[in-house]
């Protein structure tokens, strides 16, 4: 009827605990890096806007 998983070696072996943790750490590090860049752009962008407004006024 439906397809069943075979044990003929066609499935990927499960990752080790170390590999899973390493992958999760890399993903979290990337997220924090992106978040930090966004925050830096927001903070620095506000300072630039204020300087530009002072020049125009």
Curated annotation (Swiss-Prot):
Domain of life: Eukaryota
GO biological process: negative regulation of cell population proliferation; shoot system development
GO CC terms in record: plasma membrane
Entry membrane topology: Single-pass membrane protein
Membrane-spanning segments: 29-45
PANTHER family given in the database record: DVL19-RELATED-RELATED
Pfam family, one: DVL
Similarity comment text for this entry: Belongs to the DVL/RTFL small polypeptides family.
Annotated localization: Cell membrane
Origin species: Arabidopsis thaliana (Mouse-ear cress)
UniProt KW keywords: Cell membrane, Developmental protein, Glycoprotein, Membrane, Transmembrane, Transmembrane helix
Source species taxonomy: Eukaryota, Viridiplantae, Streptophyta, Embryophyta, Tracheophyta
Coiled coil regions, renumbered to chain: none
Annotated region described as Required for DVL/RTFL small polypeptide activity, given as residue ranges: 16-47
Function comment: Small polypeptide acting as a regulatory molecule which coordinates cellular responses required for differentiation, growth and development, probably by restricting polar cell proliferation in lateral organs and coordinating socket cell recruitment and differentiation at trichome sites.
Annotated glycan sites: 5
Originating gene: DVL20
Main location: membrane
Annotated protein name in UniProt: Small polypeptide DEVIL 20
């Amino acid at each position: 009827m439906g397809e069943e998983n075979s044990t003929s070696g066609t499935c990927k072996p499960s990752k080790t605990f170390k590999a899973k943790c390493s992958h999760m750490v890399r993903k979290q590090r990337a997220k924090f890096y992106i978040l930090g860049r966004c925050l830096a752009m927001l903070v620095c962008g506000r300072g630039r806007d204020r300087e530009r407004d002072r020049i125009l006024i």
